[in-house]
């Protein structure tokens, strides 16, 4: 049995996900994150699991195997990083129409929003002490 595989990196906030995507001829969808099943790693959180699986659901792909290695950030950022990496890796295997679907739905775009740094003289990034005119 020959496996087609590809290795891709996805980033979100301070999370970095490196995935290896296998597309075997048969077999169900299996996602392992840092050696654990995705449902267990994401602490039984259905929202984050749905985020990770959304590229496969959009393209109606049932035969896949994903090995993801993530570090940094929280569960939500890690899930988004995995989603981006999966989408990028799928874009290599699929036709142009399906790639366009991914692009239109924002799956191939990196969300560059990250935490703003704290400035000196302020309490937080933008929270200033109360201003008194007199």
From Swiss-Prot:
Its main location: plastid. GO terms for cellular component: chloroplast; small ribosomal subunit. Keywords: Chloroplast, Plastid, Ribonucleoprotein, Ribosomal protein. Transmembrane segments: none annotated. It comes from the Eukaryota. One of its GO terms (biological process) is translation. GO terms for molecular function: RNA binding; structural constituent of ribosome. SUPFAM superfamilies: Ribosomal protein S5 domain 2-like. It is found in: Plastid, Chloroplast. Belongs to the universal ribosomal protein uS9 family. This is Small ribosomal subunit protein uS9c.
């Amino acid at each position: 049995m020959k496996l087609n595989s590809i290795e891709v990196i996805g980033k979100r906030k301070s999370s970095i996900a490196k995935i290896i995507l296998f597309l075997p001829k048969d077999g169900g969808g299996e996602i392992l994150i840092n050696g654990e099943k995705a449902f267990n790693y994401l602490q039984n959180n259905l929202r984050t699991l749905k985020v990770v699986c959304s590229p496969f659901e959009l393209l109606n792909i049932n035969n896949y195997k994903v090995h993801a290695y993530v570090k940094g950030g929280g569960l939500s950022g890690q899930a988004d990083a995995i989603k981006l990496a999966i989408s990028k890796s799928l874009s290599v295997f699929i036709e142009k129409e399906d790639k366009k679907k991914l692009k239109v739905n924002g799956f191939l775009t990196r969300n560059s929003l990250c935490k703003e740094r704290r400035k000196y003289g302020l309490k937080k990034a933008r929270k200033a002490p109360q201003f008194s005119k007199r």
